[in-house]
Structure formats: C-alpha cells, structure tokens
Amino acid sequence: MAGIGRVALMQEPVAAVMSVMKAHQIDGTFLIYDLGGGTLDIAIAQSTAGRVSLLSHGGIALCGGRDFDRRVRESIVKPWLTANFDLPEDFSIHPKYRRLMRMAALAVERAKIELSAKDSATISLSEAETQCADECGSEIYIDCDLTRDDFNQLIADCVDKSITAAREAIQKAGLSPFDIERIVFI
C-alpha cells in the first residue's frame, strides 16, 4: 500500500520488553506481567540469540491500579466519611463533593504506595486540602487506616483473575508453567 512491509501490532509494554530482550541478548521464555492503571496485559515471549518471538498475549480490562483505588474508596473511605459527616447518600457523585472525591483518590493512591513498604497506612486529608463542608457546615477531613491485609482482601479477586489470565496465556502459547524461565513485572 505505502511500500511498507507487513507490520505486527502489539501492546506497548510487550514491545518495550521485547526491545530490551533483543538489545541485551537475553535468551529464554518470559511471562510479561504488566499491571497498569486500568488494565492488566500478559504476554509470553521467547528470546533466542537476539530474535524475539511473541508466543501469546492476553489480559483483563478494568483490572489495574485505578480499579484497586476505587475499591478502597468505596469500601473504606466512603463508609468512613458517612460515619463521620452529614453527607447525602449520593455524595460521591454530587457536584458539591467532586473536589473531595478527587482529593480522596489521590490520598488513597498515596496510601497504596505506602503499603508497599509498610503493613498499614493512613488515608488522610486535612480540611484545608478538601476545602469542603458537609450538609451541617462542618469542615470535612479524612483520617482512616488501610492495612495491607485489608487491601489484599479488597483486590483478591483481581489477583486471582490475573493468575488465571497468566495461565491462559501460557496454555495459549502451548507451554506449561515449568517452561517459563523468567517473569518480568512492569
């Protein structure tokens, strides 16, 4: 058509890992596990003498960091707010509380990152950060705890689905888990 040979389309994380494997002459069969903000991408690639082949790929939409954050907001932050402030039932979608929910999303993400090094974290926002009052005029703040165990429990089904997706990608490549020599987490 435009003088371009056959082109293979692939997901960006898969292309990046394949480029690194080729540049560094790393041989083996790899499972690439890319848990992004909104999706999980899984690929099985094989590298031999600088030649990289994509054997299979798969993944899960709506299984990423933002989904984990949403679960924490829905299960921990929203109940804490309704227990401590006079808020309408639909406050999380109410325009008056839009800033509060955006700020809460950032606080949840900070706490989630903190959990990578600690067993618990505090999801906190001061009154000055939220710049929001409840229906009675009380200034709203957030100060609730998130433990690693609570977080793991909230995302357990997504983790289980990701393991299933990895097994399916391995099977689709015609391999067994014992054939995977390296796992690359992105």
Feature locations, PLM:
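Oxyanion-binding/catalytic loops of NTP- or PPi-dependent enzymes
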Residues: 1-186
